[in-house]
Amino acid sequence: MFDSSKIQPYIAFTDLREWIREAESLGEVKTVLGASWQEEIGLATDVVVPPDDGPAVIFDEVPGSPKGFRLLINCFAGKRRAMTLGFPQGLTKQELSDAYFTHYQKDPKHIPPVIVDDGPVFENVLTGDAVDIMKFPTPIWHANDGGRYIGTGCYSVTMDPDEKWINAGCYRAMIQDEKSVSLLMVPGKHGYMHREKYFKRGEKMPLALVIGGDPLFFFMAGTEQPYGLCEYDIVGGMRKKPVECVRGKITGLPFPANSEIVFEGYLNNNNRKFEGPFGEWTGYYASDESAQPVLEIEAIYHRKDPIILGVPPIGGGSDEMARYRAIMRSAMLKQQLQSAGVPDVTQVWSHEIGASRMLIALAIKQRYAGHAKQVGVLAASCGASVYGCKMVIVVDDDIDVSNLDQLMWAMLSRYDPATSVDILRRMRSTPADPRLTPEQRKVRDFTNSRMVIDATRPYEWRDQFPKVNAPSQEIVRKARDMFGYLLK
């Protein structure tokens, strides 16, 4: 039986360059020279990102950008998943999530950042006429995108004007011109909440946009953290030491001193430009272009030979965004269910196939009648899972919930369509949901319905349910240890 408490996590990198060296030591980094931003980088991304074990790829010598200005894609796949999270190689994705839960989620030790005077990000400081973001290698990721999205693996640093806490959140950024990008912030997200406070006062919002940096910051910024908790504190706790931050010379906002590229300026409600469309995580161009506030960039900071972190959604299946969110969101949901007092939830998996949002599977050790429905309804509503969910499936603990074949088999053989399904209505959805009606979009009604499926053996006669003819998960693991070499 896997025991995640016996693992001693160690994150061996502190910035993107050290991350690349670690990934290179695993033999999982390739370099492409001369690919065009207009089409070829996007095509290469479509090839390498969907496979579960595709390599990380660095693009250099991109026409239109100085040599040495690089772009990295596909950081979270293959052996790089365990390496990025500080865990040993050889763990399954469910075991990675269990280890993440045990060491980073169950009882987190947050460590606030420290402010330092200088850092590598200030190797180049550009202001005034020198501000020109067009020199950075920024591709058209999808053929019908409305522009060049420099911010896909980025995060926006903002401060609550009242409570003064710092948030780092992921919001896509499209280039408008040499000195500005438009940012799409979705209602309910923490950056949006900060933005609205400034705008209601008639003020611009100070913002630092980190375009290239340590993948851990992007991962933490891209998952649903508690309101008021700074993502820097989370990463500091994971590393067991504080993050070193510098303050921007324009806004005073803190950002990691070893960031690759940072744009600093003010988000202006009175300067809106059309943003989008963009091929989003649902696999669709689900929303048209819309007028969004522009970040007026007053300073660019970047290291020598800077590296953009690119994490574009592929959609229609699994991509690196779905892979990292599956591990982290599953652990977060498990912790939230435990905090709600729900007993014996043995496994949680937020499936990649729905961008780790739409399909959630849970295994339980049944304790009482109604246990499965309790778990399913709560899982459909928790903070880690409520956004964009469409389906929750609850199964018995003999099923590997991260295995779609096992999950579908359990559902088809153990649930009854007439009696095992509950529909929840007016739940929180997302503007990226392609199933929102035109009428909903007109009034910004971003809600959906979702299905809770009880695919457990019926509690009242579970002992009479036919026995399965397959070995237990423990026996399967033993068999793989003994005979896995036959598959190599």
Task: Give a label for each model feature.
Residues 1-294, 298-488:
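Extended, highly charged
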